Amino acid sequence: MEIELRNEKAIYGCVRTAGFPFLKTFDDFDFSFQPTLNKEQILDFKNLRFIENNENIIFVGSPGVGKTHLATSIGIKAAQNRNSTYFINCNDLIANLKKAQSENRFINRLNHYARYKVLIIDEVGFLPMDLDGANMLFQLINKRYEKHSTIITTNKPFGKWHEIFNDVTLANAILDRLLHHSHIILSLIHI
């Protein structure tokens, strides 16, 4: 009983410290709302093999179609299995990294985000970012490459990522590292 209680507290702590915007699970997602989604593929993420294989998951689709909900559901499942997990909006991530750089703590902050087994970066490309921010994101993605899993949500197709970062070469470098060993969930449409 005591071991079970300790385990429950540890799981609760993992979920609480992950910073999820809400606590929604796979059971809360209405797959009939998104008939183009491969439900089997999405539910297969519950087994968390993608973490063991250091694979990424990228959700691409219009605003309001459930990308954040699904990314959060996967993250909650990972945290419940005691994998270090963190959720952050892309603009907040870049702002935190820039603040750390101005305080001469950039490497520490970069390492902080790089160490999570699962890092969820929400809304990549919702707002464009300057070259400094794009370089910081590249450094983070590069540091995590083939070491940990990253989950991305974006409303921009990959062919338009150069618009986000204002640099074709940098966009290609980020995409190269993200897309290698990735599960890409496309065609999330707003009905």
Give, region by region, the residue ranges found by the protein language model.
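Conserved P-loop NTPase "ATPase switch" module shared by AAA+ and STAND
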Residues: 113-129
